[in-house]
């Protein structure tokens, strides 16, 4: 049963300020950039991104998919962007290692609609048992890395990343 109320992240009220954590700010930035497809393999510290897209997908007109692993999540998002959609893919920090095979070919093939990969890190071991700083992946994958310091940075950088891609 629908209440007719939009999820707060979907409300379009220019000038209205809302308090969002970083993961939700990334979702909002993707929506503002016109994301049409989102895939992910859920895992902390990135779980809220995929879970939020799962809840709002129909109302936001975003195709959403939980994938069987991070590699598949990247591959289906890449296929969506090759078809012209603006695509996002989300994963935890350790998943980036697993998804490197398809990611490493993307700079050479290029994208059509724009693609942003969100790899939520945990360099201080706050929410995960493994420490990894995935910013170093930029060097050998030949892809830019955006490293937001605040939720507002996360929203803006997600929008900017789509334009950059």
Predicted regions and their residues:
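Thiamine diphosphate
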Residues: 1-158
């Amino acid at each position: 049963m629908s209440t007719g109320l939009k999820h707060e992240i979907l409300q379009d009220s220019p000038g209205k300020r809302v308090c969002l954590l970083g993961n939700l700010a990334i979702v909002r930035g993707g929506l503002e950039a016109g994301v049409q497809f989102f895939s992910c393999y859920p895992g902390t510290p990135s779980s809220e991104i995929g879970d939020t897209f799962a809840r709002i997908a129909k109302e936001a007109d975003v195709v959403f998919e939980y994938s069987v692993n991070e590699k598949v999540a990247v591959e289906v998002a890449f296929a969506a962007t090759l078809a012209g959609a603006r695509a996002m893919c989300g994963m935890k920090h350790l998943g980036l290692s697993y998804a490197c095979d398809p990611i490493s070919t993307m700079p050479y093939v290029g994208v059509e609609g724009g693609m942003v990969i969100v790899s939520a890190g945990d360099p201080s071991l706050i929410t995960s048992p493994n420490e990894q700083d995935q910013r170093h992946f930029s060097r050998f994958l030949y892809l830019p890395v955006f490293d937001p310091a605040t939720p507002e940075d996360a929203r803006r950088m997600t929008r900017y990343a789509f334009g950059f891609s």
